[in-house]
Amino acid sequence: SSDPESAAELHVENFAGQAAVNTSRPVAMPNGTTVQVKGDILGPWTEGIGMGATDLGVMAPLDDREYAMVFGDSFTGKAFGKGTWMSPTGVIAETDNNGFVTVQRPMNSGSKVEKLISYYQEGNLTLIPSDIINIDGTLYMQAMWNNGIGNVSNTQIWKSTSRGREWTSIGYTGNSYMGGMGDLISWEEGDDGYIYAVSSSFKRADPVYLSRFKLEDIDDRTKWELYDPDTDNWTDEAAPILSKNVQAGEMNLRYIQGYWVLVMFNDATDAIEVRISDTLERDWNDVPVSTIAKAGSWSDKQSPTNWSQPYGGYIVPGSTIDNLDVVVSQWNTDTNKRYMSTQFNVRGLDTFYGIDSSELPPLREVVPAKDEPTGRGNGGGGGASLSANMDEETERIVTIVGVLAGIAALAAMSFPYWRGALPPQLREFLHI
């Protein structure tokens, strides 16, 4: 095609990572790091799983080799909006001997990708994952109920003891919590018994906050402690840890070789940025920024210095400070032709941050994910249940539904009218 935009998109699509064919050459960035586009996560090599277009791709290790990879809005076709719409979806992946992320199979049972959480999907309702984590062999996932992207009604946390085939709800939080600044999160386990979470709104307009909690409190965010960098105290009131020239989008926090690594899409700079610090409890405005993907025109060749409409940014398990793999999303919102998660490789962050990589400890050992038999035999069903932390309105609705369930005929006749009034977490529980 003579259309420069189509040519640019074809250039990206030809990053055939699995065979190391047409992978981009490493690009020297202004700060001295080197960034290489390794290739798209999906392509001809993954057609068998029934998913052709997707974004995000948050990851958590399952063992020393495989990792869970969870995506947002996904489609069976090869462009945004083409084919069946599913969210969230997941695959099991690993990194091959050449350093490429390779999809092995769907996370759910069966040979085709399905929604990980079962719910009635109508209108603009969608469930977008924030992050996934492996704690002592149990997977935990936090996701946001959106009535149209950016319009978060509430968030929910699930757990899985079947390597992601089946999920059970354990916690529900209204978006009034932290004034919405706790909707979008990324979490990581520290070495001190706490799990730490960075958070912001899902509007790409606000700063970054820091929380911590014990595992037994993961389902009750009112028990999470909030950090104030001005006082260096943990209380029930938060202040931003990162706010200067920042409008936080998707984030990923990981503890790697004794350092806290934060990857983030920053809408203020229209770039995917990396920040690394040996201390988490600090003012992150003082941490130097390393850009790994900068927005640019679709009419120009796609590269780390011109990656049109980027977002996301998720660290691949097994990454090290001096060899960091990050999955970056890209969506051409004008044509919807280009909608994909793509692997980037970053070298030289150790030098940029003054870290002697030869002195770094090995990566933390991975506790193998539990692989218990699933009760439903269908990972697509999600196995979800209502949170024990329902608010009063939800409890009231549950009571009403119970009465309606006892009057089967009336319930059937009334269904079209009361279904729309139910909150997403109740629809998910009832699978309607």
Question: Regions from the language model: what does each represent?
Answer:
Residues 3, 7-50, 61-123, 134-178, ...:
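Beta-rich carbohydrate-recognition and catalytic domains
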Residues 53-62, 121-136, 180-193, 247-256, ...:
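Structural signature of eukaryotic scaffold interfaces centered on beta-propeller domains
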Residues 357-375, 383-386:
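Long, low-complexity intrinsically disordered regions
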Residues 375-401:
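Extracellular Ser/Thr-rich, low-complexity/disordered mucin-like segments
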Residues 401-417:
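A cross-kingdom C-terminal cell-surface attachment/processing module
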Residues 421-432:
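Cytoplasmic C-terminal tails of single-pass
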